[in-house]
């Protein structure tokens, strides 16, 4: 695929002519607004080039965390993006979206791929492992990684977010961490604030080694430093 950006900031893409009469599979993570536009252009270009079917694979679906209007006057952004993607494709495949409910927003068949189990592969031998998610919503990921590892306990932190300031407050839920190896599991690490605060809480509780894992390491700004 060829990409070009014009002086005014607009994009254009070009797909190989070989897609004529074939199924075109577009693989593109929508990590920012430009990427969303390029996906829509790729879909249209594939149709224009004669593809008989278009399958859109979105490993990371941007805006999936905005699955509801959190304040008056806000859109349901993930719904808007899903509808836009649906217009140019026959099927959508994506990996561990922040909220599985976003699949209801697509107007074409959508498939979820769960990659969380792969997070267990690089883990070393753990001592009394505890698999923790930063909030209750991600506990399923912790279960999946624990099951893939083959041993351990799961639990989650209580997390409260102030949608006006963006501040996050984290508190423990109950499972003892002292002296145990802890694996933190989440779907996305964006700014890193949640994970860094979780690590700090575990340090205060005298946990053993702490391993941070996620499916989608966005690592915006200074997240890696945190």
Residue ranges, per PLM feature:
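PRPP-associated nucleotide enzymes
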Residues: 1-226
């Amino acid at each position: 695929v060829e990409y070009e950006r014009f002086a005014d900031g607009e994009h254009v893409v070009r797909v190989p002519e070989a897609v004529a009469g074939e199924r075109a599979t577009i693989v593109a993570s929508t990590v920012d607004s430009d990427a969303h536009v390029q996906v829509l252009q790729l879909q249209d270009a594939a149709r224009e080039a004669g593809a008989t079917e278009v399958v859109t694979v979105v490993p990371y679906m941007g805006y999936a965390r905005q699955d509801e209007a959190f304040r008056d006057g806000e859109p349901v952004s993930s719904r808007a993006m899903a509808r836009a993607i649906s217009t140019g494709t026959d099927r959508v495949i994506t990996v561990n979206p922040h909220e599985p409910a976003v699949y209801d927003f697509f107007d074409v068949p959508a498939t979820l791929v769960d990659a969380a189990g792969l997070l267990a592969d690089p883990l070393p031998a753990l001592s009394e492992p505890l698999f923790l998610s930063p909030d209750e919503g991600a506990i399923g990921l912790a279960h999946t990684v624990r099951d893939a590892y083959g041993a351990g306990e799961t639990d989650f932190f209580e997390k409260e977010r102030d949608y006006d300031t963006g501040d996050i407050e984290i508190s423990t839920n109950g499972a003892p961490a002292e002296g145990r190896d802890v694996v933190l599991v989440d779907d996305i690490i964006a700014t890193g604030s949640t994970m860094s605060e979780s690590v700090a809480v575990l340090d205060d509780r005298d946990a053993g080694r702490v391993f941070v894992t996620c499916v989608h390491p966005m690592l915006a700004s200074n997240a890696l430093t945190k």
